[in-house]
Amino acid sequence: MAFVLRKTKMTDVRTIHRLLMDCASKKLLLPRSYTELYAHLRDFIVAEDAETANVVGCCALSITWEGLAEVRSLAVAEEAQGQGVGRRLVEACVSDALTFGIYKVFTLTYQVDFFRRLGFQEVSKDVLPQKVWADCIKCPQFPECDETAMMIEL
């Protein structure tokens, strides 16, 4: 499958939500509400099938603190998995971080092997206090988080 990456449009929100909820139902990531998606729309990029123009993946880069950003809400449609969509989305977010002068990018994930192949290494959640107090404290799984914290230093 050929695909292109692009910034999101308002019309992508429902598709992004559907992708995220599908992955959340499989316990691959945490769900995001429409409110969160609209509030953070500018953080997202999408992968679009070059032939059909359907959105087949999404990922967001969220700046969390000086010099630190998070790759979050990575989701790829089942029919597009295994074709490099997720890898390209994460690489684009990491590249975006560099344009902001951010040299540390982290993720909280259940997909440890995938992120390890992209150069991320496991870290203690203790090195991410801004994340814990900004987002994690609102999570229904807090304080019993079962996601793995991973980081790449650029």
Describe the residue ranges of each PLM region.
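Conserved active-site alpha-helix within GNAT-family acetyltransferase domains
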Residues: Y103, T109-D135
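Conserved acetyl-CoA-binding loop-helix of GNAT-fold acetyltransferases
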Residues: G82-S95, T107
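A generic "binding-loop/recognition-motif" signal
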Residues: D12, G67, Y110-Q111
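A short beta-loop-alpha structural element at the N-terminal edge
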Residues: A2-I16
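C-terminal "cap" of GNAT-fold acetyltransferases
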Residues: L128-L154
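Conserved glycine-rich acetyl-CoA-binding loop
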Residues: N54, A77-R88, F100, R117
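Active-site rim helix/loop that mediates acceptor-substrate recognition in acyltransferases
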Residues: L19-E51, V55
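Conserved beta-strand in the GNAT
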Residues: V46, A53-I63, G67-A75
